[in-house]
Amino acid sequence: MTKLLSLRSTRASWIDGLREEQAAAALQVLGIAGFALLTALGAQFSARVYLWEVPITLQTLAVYGSGLFLGARNGLLAQLLYLSLGLFVPVYAGDGTGVAYFAGAASAGYLLAYPFAAAVVGFLSKRWKTLAGSTVAMLAGSALLFTVGVSWLHYAADHASWWTSIDRGWLRFVVIDLAKIIAVAVVYSGVRGLFPAEDA
């Protein structure tokens, strides 16, 4: 039980070689481009619930994953690349594109928080590589993501109260986001276990 709840892992993995402090330049570029593409693909799986101002997407799976697998800097760069692509190509949820999207989308704050959420996850998971550690790292990234997203939503949607913004921008997504975090943590922990460094 103690080992299960431990944040730090003493076991190295081949997967750790993908992070910026260890990866070759070509592998770093591939990782950044790959997670930018995964984030774009996640936006295509978008569901809008009636009267909900923020769509449900799979993007945060890639946001959290980019921090875990690539580290803070490259996770941030992957999400910046995704946002940059969206200025010219319709890769945002709902086929949104361009600077005008940010001016009119109530959910744009979440997008702007992606790079920073990935960086937080990457920074914390540099040492916290266990199932519990990666989960805590993603919870911290999620807290930042929703803080920025809800704040943007409050002013963009002109809500009468902060409680309305918190309800519509966070509380409705808590269970969904926790499920995503657990899924990514299980995959990350499982992959690290499958590829120990001594077998690489």
What are these regions (language model features)?
Residues 88, 106-115, 119, 123, ...:
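Mid-bilayer segments of alpha-helical transmembrane spans in multi-pass integral membrane proteins
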Residues 52, 96, 128-199:
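Membrane-embedded alpha-helical hairpins and interfacial helices in multi-pass inner-membrane proteins
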Residues 36-44, 83-93, 142-150:
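Aromatic-anchored segments of alpha-helical transmembrane domains
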Residues 29-33, 61-65, 76-80, 107-112, ...:
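Hydrophobic alpha-helical transmembrane segments
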Residues 45-119:
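Alpha-helical membrane segments and adjacent membrane-interface helices in multi-pass membrane proteins
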Residues 1-33, 167-200:
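Alpha-helical transmembrane segments and their cytosolic interface
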Residues 2-76:
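Hydrophobic transmembrane alpha-helices
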Residues 69-73, 120-128, 190-195:
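Structural signal for the C-terminal ends of transmembrane alpha-helices
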